[in-house]
Amino acid sequence: MPSDIEIARAATLKPIAQVAEKLGIPDEALHNYGKHIAKIDHDFIASLEGKPEGKLVLVTAISPTPAGEGKTTTTVGLGDALNRIGKRAVMCLREPSLGPCFGMKGGAAGGGKAQVVPMEQINLHFTGDFHAITSAHSLAAALIDNHIYWANELNIDVRRIHWRRVVDMNDRALRAINQSLGGVANGFPREDGFDITVASEVMAVFCLAKNLADLEERLGRIVIAETRDRKPVTLADVKATGAMTVLLKDALQPNLVQTLEGNPALIHGGPFANIAHGCNSVIATRTGLRLADYTVTEAGFGADLGAEKFIDIKCRQTGLKPSAVVIVATIRALKMHGGVNKKDLQAENLDALEKGFANLERHVNNVRSFGLPVVVGVNHFFQDTDAEHARLKELCRDRLQVEAITCKHWAEGGAGAEALAQAVVKLAEGEQKPLTFAYETETKITDKIKAIATKLYGAADIQIESKAATKLAGFEKDGYGGLPVCMAKTQYSFSTDPTLMGAPSGHLVSVRDVRLSAGAGFVVVICGEIMTMPGLPKVPAADTIRLDANGQIDGLF
């Protein structure tokens, strides 16, 4: 089969106005970026306020493995399949970060015959949203140092500035730096560092804001430093929010593109799935719901991280509620969770599959604990055997009373996911229960952490290190105790040990640090080592990306 980029390049794309017509978006509401990309105007989005909303479908997954699950591919394939069976459907996805495109991951726009296009533009610069977010974040950093340089009227303690700088690139050399060197004219020297743009709180705020006014208000709440007497200093205090909002004004308009089958997709925002909530923008999701029968969206990593945050943070803040949840699994990944080495995954192994099923089982039960109906989408790989698929369906039916559906959208496009689409419609249009959360926000922050660890991760208890405990007490004292929590831990395990696969139980979840994201509206709980500025691997994807003799991009996935 051709590579993803070869498939994408061979596709005949529709003019973006034709794609917009499927959602009833008029030409005058589009700001075109070439022939196949457009932003949807703020005024048109505001005019949709009060319209009835369609069904929301959340796509999540088992705990990821190096074998791959194909969550974005399934999201795209399901959206295409829903359109094929007569439902007006739109997909809502996160924008890919530039850094990982040149690092380990390569491009991120689905795969095979279930892709969003134009692939090259989506992966490289797109409409400039991430550049706008980087610029807004950098402006805030400049204003903070400028305030300190010119008399420091807010009495900011230069030892307690929390606002690091950002760049949308994997660059380990920037993780820790010394700034303002070279003399008095350059400001006050201090230690600083860079994160990747998707780790910026501006990105999280961008993706949770309801509109421009809400964006500016949330930016103003971001705590960027402390005073000498340990009082919080916000971006509003340094008068940064107006100019930052101006930089973000156009970026906040959702981006409209299409799938290989010409169906609409909204790709907008892209926060980290560990130190942030890992979902596309609220504005894009709401826009999709008001224009389509079905809006299919995904949440980052496995259901223990992505789906939990989608519900406990995004749904809690916005009132959204999924009508159905798809948990993506693969035979390969379940065998890895059952102890099989990656190099041995091609061999049939029903025993390992059954052992690894414990991971899927816990994810299904966790999602059901929120009151949501679930179906399992089994992403088919050509090495899978019929016996393995039959055994997985049997396990799902007998032990979970849930349907598992084999999907072949990677090879067949939407036609390969029609059975999954029919199952999703049946769930979404069936009986719905009230949405429940893993915890109530009125409880103490430590109780919220414990609720997630014990209810969803299978942990016996939590262990909070002294530095984190001191900071939590400060958050409670400063009035932030009512915020939800955003767990930052390894995506590869229910525990904080990435090598502990399957469904471990009885472990301790150790809390190393906590961070306040007051603008986004949550407390980040850091369990283990979390990297906010990735590095490049020994052989980065950038090594093989080039322009060919015809000026076409080669090597991008």
UniProtKB/Swiss-Prot annotation:
What is catalyzed by this enzyme? (6S)-5,6,7,8-tetrahydrofolate + formate + ATP = (6R)-10-formyltetrahydrofolate + ADP + phosphate
Q: Which domain of life is it from?
A: Bacteria
Where would one find coiled-coil regions in this protein?
none
UniProt xrefs under InterPro entries: Formate_THF_ligase, Formate_THF_ligase_CS, P-loop_NTPase
User: EC number(s) of the enzyme?
Assistant: 6.3.4.3
Please indicate if the UniProt record lists ATP-binding as a keyword. Answer: yes
Which principal EC class is assigned to this enzyme? ligase
Query: Which terms in the Gene Ontology molecular function aspect does this entry carry?
Result: ATP binding; formate-tetrahydrofolate ligase activity
Q: Which Pfam families match?
A: FTHFS (PF01268)
Q: Which GO terms describe its biological process?
A: tetrahydrofolate interconversion
The family line of this record is: Belongs to the formate--tetrahydrofolate ligase family.
What does the subunit section of this Swiss-Prot or TrEMBL entry state? Homotetramer.
What is the designated name of this protein? Formate--tetrahydrofolate ligase
- The source organism is Methylorubrum extorquens (strain ATCC 14718 / DSM 1338 / JCM 2805 / NCIMB 9133 / AM1)
Taxonomic classification: Bacteria, Pseudomonadati, Pseudomonadota, Alphaproteobacteria, Hyphomicrobiales
Q: Which gene encodes it?
A: fhs
